Amino acid sequence: MAGAIRVTMEVGADGVAVVTICNPPVNALHPIIIQGLKEKYAEAMDRDDVKAIVLTGAGGKFCGGFDINVFTEVHKTGNVSLMPDVSVELVSNLMEAGKKPSVAAIQGLALGGGLELTMGCHARISTPEAQLGLPELTLGIIPGFGGTQRLPRLVGLPKAIEMMLQSKFITAKEGKEGGLVDALCSPDELIKMSRLWALEIANYRKPWIRSLARTDRLGSLSEARSVLNSARQQAKKVAANLPQHQACLDVMEEGVLCGGHAGVLKEAKVFKELVLSPTSKALVHAFFAQRLTTKVPGVTDVQLKPRKIRKVAVIGGGLMGSGIATALLVSNTSVVLKEVNPQFLQRGQKMIAANLEGLVKRGSLTKDKMNKAMSLLKGALDYSDFKDVDMVIEAVIEKIPLKQSIFSDLEKVCPPHCILATNTSTIDLNVVGEKTNSQDRIIGAHFFSPAHIMPLLEIVRTEKTSPQAILDLITVGKMIKKVPVVVGNCTGFAVNRTFFPYTQGSHLLVSIGIDVFRIDRVISSFGMPMGPFQLQDLAGYGVALAVKDIYAAAFGTRNLDSNLVDLMVQNGRQGKSNGKGYYLYEKGGKPKPDPSVQVVIDEYRRCAKTMPGGKPVTLSDQDILEMIFFPVVNEACRVMDENVVIRASDLDIASILGMGFPKFRGGLVFWADTIGAPYIHSKLSKWTEIYGDFFKPSSYLEDRAKRSLPLSAPNATQQASSRSRM
């Protein structure tokens, strides 16, 4: 096996064969690696000069798991035989049942199939901070190399279920406390200690433990069944649409009832079935799509190097500004928070402190790191601290004259290299920077609320934004643990523009007689975090009212003119902010549907006059789902046609991370392609005849439907000067 992907074996004078996985950067289990492991293990078992084996990984990492690229090939071909036999042939027969003991020497990480290999060894030695986990369920599958059987036997059912169903990583130090790791040592001592341990097993001075044969951590049959049943009920609540959760529990139960070997055989069968499931195809697509978002033609492929961003100024300490500042502070970036008066500044600083305390409570930040973050924050009422900032992010209210004035000032007070970013969600960037001469430095940094938690960052460029500014903001996005998606400059950018029909479609359904709370139930059941009306309550009605005229001007006849939000406000309803919207909100309680909102709904229907003959329309749940999401798909087609996004998969990630579109459906465009353009076009055409241009199919969709092409296929007319590539 030539090249970087290989398995090596070195036999020392002590009789220990050190087998090393070499596949940078994380030693993924490519089929070549798996074949190499089989060959080296077979050779070690046959050689008289080998007494024991140490399995490790090159470059300070044990193994990051199975090579996910293989799943893509399986999905393309439908040929599951491309998956090599690892569970039985390698882990069970060659490693665990082998006549010579194996010890896993772990550092860096042992994830997925990597951790499963270690559990096929007879002992595990690790550095304390190594990350251990079985994250397979995030890809729509289950551990397939024996993990569902061995992990419960090493750490007990409750911990194993937690690690697998939540895809939770633990450190090796935690693993030692729980029984997964046998001993901890420094990186310098790892191989030496592992060799000695392997020899002591071979010489019967340490126990020769085959994990699959253990039952002492499983508890009694009744206890195991109780734990599994409880886990099933929990999975139904939190993962109702995800088949891999119940499948994982089924396979674990098989092992408990019928023994480890029977469990391994069932695991292998179910694993192959799940690899070909729609859920796995969608989640694997989303995995690779997220990696692609940072590949930007003309920016990341032209030998530019990102500049160091050490100090950032945030203008505006409201909800968005304080959230953005929080995200920067947590990443150890110095922040200047500017406000217009001491009261607003103090409020912004308090919001940042509250955000940080919230992260501590959630366990994602230590108290020490919180204090360090706060020490990096400086308040300001003028621009005197802007002379050495590397980036400014403006996050004030959506008023054009105010933003123009700020950017005109920034050009005068900031250094020439400073990036001038705006968090606007609706205003044309060319308008924002109209009164400056530094248009190449102006860029959109559109965060989603709450900015320190939501993972998406829309990076908006104009035709004048420099590639360097884009690259720098991509780098900052990654630094603050956001997923950056580069988009073009248009009303609503990619996410808000694509999803503007989402709320409007729900309003149309209400106008023709469909119950508000039924709509929310249908959309939640589909996999959205909440329905459109609960989302409106949470976001507040101010945003909807603020963008109403902007969308009407930009989108013309396909914009639905609805006065439902106006009527809600007139009725004294502001959503969650005043405890009363479509739902009632009590402190600490769950939202409850408010029956009294029907008065507002009735008035809205009278104003809309869209119910045929004044009678409610009868629709199935599928009709409701399609009438809300197909217009969204239709707008996504326009976004792709205008090249607002670089590729369709960027819109998939933006829909998942920005709007909560279910990841297990692969993203908006991926989901639409599973349905097909002809069907979507036919339904939209039918509704256009009944309800008007809100549903009118775009030319892009019409073309794809006529030719039965996927919506995600690259646009043949796409030019290098597309908006997202400017």
Swiss-Prot record:
It is found in: Peroxisome; Cytoplasm, Cytoskeleton. It catalyses: a (3S)-3-hydroxyacyl-CoA = a (2E)-enoyl-CoA + H2O; a 4-saturated-(3S)-3-hydroxyacyl-CoA = a (3E)-enoyl-CoA + H2O; a (3Z)-enoyl-CoA = a 4-saturated (2E)-enoyl-CoA; a (3E)-enoyl-CoA = a 4-saturated (2E)-enoyl-CoA. One of its GO terms (biological process) is fatty acid beta-oxidation. Pathway: Lipid metabolism; fatty acid beta-oxidation. Its EC number is 4.2.1.17, 5.1.2.3, 5.3.3.8, 1.1.1.35. One of its GO terms (molecular function) is 3-hydroxyacyl-CoA dehydrogenase activity. Pfam families: 3HCDH (PF00725), 3HCDH_N (PF02737), ECH_1 (PF00378). One of its GO terms (cellular component) is peroxisome. Keywords: Cytoplasm, Cytoskeleton, Fatty acid metabolism, Isomerase, Lipid metabolism, Lyase, Microtubule, Multifunctional enzyme, NAD, Oxidoreductase, Peroxisome, RNA-binding. SUPFAM superfamilies: 6-phosphogluconate dehydrogenase C-terminal domain-like, ClpP/crotonase, NAD(P)-binding Rossmann-fold domains. It comes from the Eukaryota. Multifunctional enzyme involved in fatty acid beta-oxidation. Also binds to RNA and microtubules. Possible role in subcellular mRNA localization and RNA-cytoskeleton interactions. The epimerase and isomerase activities are contained in the N-terminal region while the dehydrogenase activity is in the C-terminal region. Monomer. In the N-terminal section; belongs to the enoyl-CoA hydratase/isomerase family. This is Peroxisomal fatty acid beta-oxidation multifunctional protein.
